Amino acid sequence: MSFVVVAKFPCKPGQVDAMGELFEAALSDTRGFACCERIDVVLNEPSGTYLLVEYWDQESSYDTYLQWRTDTGIAEVLAPLIEGGGDRILGSVDSLGIMQDI
């Protein structure tokens, strides 16, 4: 069963397209990261908010990925584009848990 993570990124006014371009570039690396099963990207156009739904083989794989993203400076790249800046980034991520086959 997959470990599911949801990340919500409310864009600053006028930054939706820039965020989409950033995700297009960055998520190819994420999708190629070991043990990433899938990432779905949803844009709520009225609010200018992106929602990423990520599926990993297990929680520790996601933790390894998140550390890599942190170490390579993703927060500094995202900060100018999202409401609340850098302080908002980690607070926008929810590690939901294990997908259930019910």
What function would you assign to each model-found segment?
Residues 89-102:
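Acidic/histidine-enriched, glycine/proline-rich intrinsically disordered or flexible terminal extensions
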Residues 3-9, 38-66:
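Short, well-ordered beta-strand segments in beta-rich or mixed alpha/beta enzyme
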Residues 25, 29-37, 55-90:
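An amphipathic, aromatic/His-enriched active-site/gating alpha helix that lines ligand/cofactor pockets
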Residues 10-20:
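Short, surface-exposed ligand-recognition loops at beta-strand->loop->(often short) alpha-helix junctions
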Residues 14-16, 46, 60-61, 95:
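Generic "edge-of-domain/loop-turn" microfeature
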